[in-house]
Regions:
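Metal-associated gating/positioning segment near the N- to mid-region
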Residues: 33-100
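Histidine-rich, glycine-flanked metal-binding segment
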Residues: 1-39
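Histidine/acidic-residue-rich, glycine-tolerant segments that coordinate divalent metal ions
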Residues: 80-91, 95-180
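Divalent metal-coordination and catalytic microenvironments
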Residues: 5, 10, 34, 45, ...
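Receiver (REC) domain switch-region micro-motif
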Residues: 29, 42, 130
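Alpha-helical transmembrane segments and their juxtamembrane interfaces
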Residues: 19, 53-57, 141, 173
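Short, glycine/acidic-enriched loop or turn micro-motifs at the edges of active sites
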Residues: 17, 46-48, 166
Length: 180
């Protein structure tokens, strides 16, 4: 099957059946006969480690690698240094990505025992979700108080990506495995 795609200002403007003529004259035609056109991948769980661990990689290097692999959008986790658990840290990440990323991006906001009241203020058109650790976590991102968990689930108003581990079960199973 064949067809054409018209791109204007880096945006797909038209998708046309085989013999359909574009509505406007085209400046450049690329013959892609024999090739496949596929949509870009959205990676909804990345750890770019920026800010804080940029000796490993940063938003620019990781987004460049992502683009080379067909990833057009990423959603970065909040366990960076500093953690993305305040509006200030979140806004700083968005500002940094605006100058570094070569693909589309969004960021998770990390829930803590002390920031559940901030969740309703998050911009749902920019923030992809709330990351919730209910088991062992890095930094202060463990949410282990029932009243806070209720607030997180009631107030988030968006996707909640949760680690629902029970640390006592993990510890018991680890001990049992080591004894075998």
């Amino acid at each position: 099957c064949g067809g054409s795609i018209v791109i204007e200002n880096e945006v797909i403007a038209e998708v046309l059946a085989e013999e359909t003529v574009p509505s406007q004259p085209c400046g450049e035609i690329i013959d892609a006969k024999g090739y496949y056109l596929m949509p870009g991948v959205i990676d909804d769980h990345v750890h770019f480690r920026d800010p804080g661990l940029t000796h490993k990689a940063d938003i620019h290097t990781e987004s460049t690698a992502a683009a080379a692999g067909g990833v057009t959008s990423f959603m970065d986790m909040p366990n960076t240094t500093p953690q993305t658990t305040t509006l200030e840290a979140l806004n700083a990440k968005f500002a940094d990505a605006a100058t570094k990323s070569i693909v589309n991006y969004s960021f998770y906001f990390g829930a803590t025992n002390t920031n559940a009241d901030v969740l309703p203020t998050l911009d749902k058109s920019r923030v992809c979700g709330v990351k919730l650790f209910m088991g062992a976590s890095t930094g202060n991102m463990l949410v282990d108080r029932m009243e806070v968990l209720r607030k997180v689930f009631a107030n988030a108003g968006m996707l909640i990506a949760a680690h629902c581990e029970e640390q006592s079960i993990i510890s018991a199973n680890t001990t049992a495995f080591k004894e075998k």
